[in-house]
């Protein structure tokens, strides 16, 4: 029923909304231009309006293109072959390139990377563990992996993202998993292991061990959860980390077991992580910010084989990430200040 609602109701509604938007676009732009002078921030409303137009337009075009691919692949019979999988990855990369080009141009967002060069992992599959904080960090990571590192990411996502029609259709045609943490009878670690199986030399398995975007409230709940489980030592270590959530090791351990040839790449980022709500994002627009990503490569030979040792190793790296974030804090904009 949920699948039918997303595919047969929501997806056509998005396409129809995009068509209606373009027919009425002059009115929307005129309204945005009239409101913009009384709203703090240079052309803030106009910029946001353009981002909304761009998003809805690309969403609708993607759905049309994906329908065409389904027809061209024999009504979906060949849609999961390597040929069509490669075309879908090219489509993802193209869409990410457009979005981030517009983010640079319209929102004045720049992205810098620090760490191993793109050719630091030649011919080796990688498992990528990333800090989860700030708006759109998963898309930024996918863009970086595809655009700069030439990788085809396999991503684990929360099932709520499947309500975006284009994401729903597209990621169900390439190696990815929508998971529902806590759902009875759903073995998340088993799904993660299945997705991480069979990585080749240009694949990157992507996982966010924290399980959710960082907020102070989630950090407190994660520490309390460890204490309820009797994991006092882990809770104490998590309490000393102030910029990250306590990592949940199960998914990463399952991925490491399923991909015994893979190196591990850990990723921290800062710049937008302090934007934890709609009000924060609104105050920061137009962004005029620099998002910095720090990458570390860990060769497989340096990763412990024992489960408890791996958990300790993961916590040690999360402490490194926490320290890096503390040293690279973004400068918050005062509320109401224009940029």
Give, region by region, the residue ranges found by the protein language model:
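Short, conserved clusters of charged catalytic residues that mark active-site
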Residues: 14, 98, 190, 247-250
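Extracellular/periplasmic catalytic domains that process cell-envelope and extracellular macromolecules
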Residues: 121, 199-200
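Membrane-proximal helical "anchor" segments flanking the first transmembrane region
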Residues: 1-127
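Catalytic core of membrane glycerolipid acyltransferases/transacylases, capturing the structured
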Residues: 67-98, 104-106, 121-122, 126-184
């Amino acid at each position: 029923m949920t699948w039918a609602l997303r595919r047969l109701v929501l997806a056509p509604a998005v396409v129809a909304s995009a068509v209606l938007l373009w027919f009425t676009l002059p009115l929307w732009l005129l309204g945005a231009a009239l409101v913009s002078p009384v709203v703090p921030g240079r052309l803030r409303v106009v910029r946001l309006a353009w981002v909304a137009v761009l998003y809805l337009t690309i969403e609708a075009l993607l759905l049309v293109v994906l329908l065409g691919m389904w027809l061209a692949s024999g009504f979906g019979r060949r849609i999961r072959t390597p040929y069509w999988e490669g075309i879908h990855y090219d489509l993802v990369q193209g869409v990410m390139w457009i979005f981030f080009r517009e983010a640079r141009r319209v929102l004045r967002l720049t992205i810098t990377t620090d760490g191993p060069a793109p050719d630091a992992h030649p011919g080796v599959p990688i498992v990528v563990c990333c800090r989860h904080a700030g708006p759109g960090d998963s898309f930024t990571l996918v863009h970086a992996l595809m655009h700069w590192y030439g990788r085809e990411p396999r991503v684990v996502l929360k099932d709520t993202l499947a309500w975006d029609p284009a994401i729903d259709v597209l990621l169900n045609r390439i190696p990815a998993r929508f998971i529902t943490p806590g759902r009875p009878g759903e073995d998340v670690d088993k799904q993660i292991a299945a997705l991480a199986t069979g990585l080749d030399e240009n694949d990157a398995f992507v996982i966010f061990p924290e399980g959710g975007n960082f907020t102070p409230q989630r950090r407190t709940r994660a520490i309390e959860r460890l204490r309820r489980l009797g994991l006092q030592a882990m809770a104490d270590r998590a309490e000393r980390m102030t910029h990250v959530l306590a990592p949940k090791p199960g998914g990463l351990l399952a991925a490491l077991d399923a991909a015994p040839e893979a190196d591990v790449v850990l990723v921290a980022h800062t710049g937008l992580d302090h934007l934890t709500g709609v009000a924060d994002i609104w105050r920061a627009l137009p962004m005029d910010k620099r998002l910095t990503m720090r990458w570390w490569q860990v060769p497989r030979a340096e990763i412990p084989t024992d489960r408890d040792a791996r958990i300790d190793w993961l916590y040690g790296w999360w402490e490194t990430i926490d320290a890096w974030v503390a040293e690279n804090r973004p400068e918050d904009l005062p509320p109401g200040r224009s940029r």
